[in-house]
């Protein structure tokens, strides 16, 4: 992910603009932290960016999965070793705030896997701020 431009707003909307900038920065931090964990082969660390709730929903090629633990278990089954996990990269991120504590993120993912073959696709995340932290509450990911 490239550098970010930062504008400081003044006037009546300055508080909202600053809050929005902080939200976007917080969301980017979650995604950067997840990428780093994945690239270390740390699926539990990657999962820290997800809402630790039975209400979490992940939609992939096999349909919806509900709950944090089931999502973790599915990741562990689908990516049993570092070679299968590869190196994750997100690009083309578009973050849209829906409310002060909710956002959607659209982007592209790519796994560089020299021995297992590269895979890539797109995703749509719904993120919520829970307990002051941004987390993924819903993840719809596809592969090409």
Where do the language-model regions lie?
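Short, low-complexity N-terminal intrinsically disordered segments enriched in polar/charged residues
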Residues: 5-49, 70
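A solvent-exposed, acidic/Ser-Thr-rich amphipathic alpha-helical stretch
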Residues: 43-98, 118
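Solvent-exposed loop/turn segments at secondary-structure junctions
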Residues: 56, 63-65, 111-112, 142-144
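Hydrophobic/aromatic beta-strand elements that line small-molecule binding cavities or substrate pockets
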Residues: 75, 91-96, 108-111, 122-128
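A short hydrophobic beta-strand element
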Residues: 101-109
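Short beta-strand edge/turn micro-motifs at domain boundaries
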Residues: 118-144
């Amino acid at each position: 992910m490239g550098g970010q431009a930062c504008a400081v707003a003044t006037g009546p909307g300055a508080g909202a603009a600053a809050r929005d900038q902080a939200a976007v920065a917080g969301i980017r931090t979650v995604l950067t932290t997840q990428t780093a964990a994945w690239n270390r082969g740390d699926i539990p660390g990657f999962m820290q960016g997800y809402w630790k709730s039975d209400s979490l929903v992940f939609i992939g090629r096999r349909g919806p999965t509900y709950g944090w633990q089931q999502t973790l278990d599915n990741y562990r089954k689908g990516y049993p070793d570092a070679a299968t996990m590869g190196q994750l990269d997100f690009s083309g991120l578009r973050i849209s705030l829906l409310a002060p504590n909710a956002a959607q993120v659209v982007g592209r993912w790519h796994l560089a896997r020299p021995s297992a073959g590269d895979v890539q696709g797109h995703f749509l995340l719904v993120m919520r701020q829970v307990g002051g932290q941004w987390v993924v509450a819903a993840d719809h990911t596809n592969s090409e």
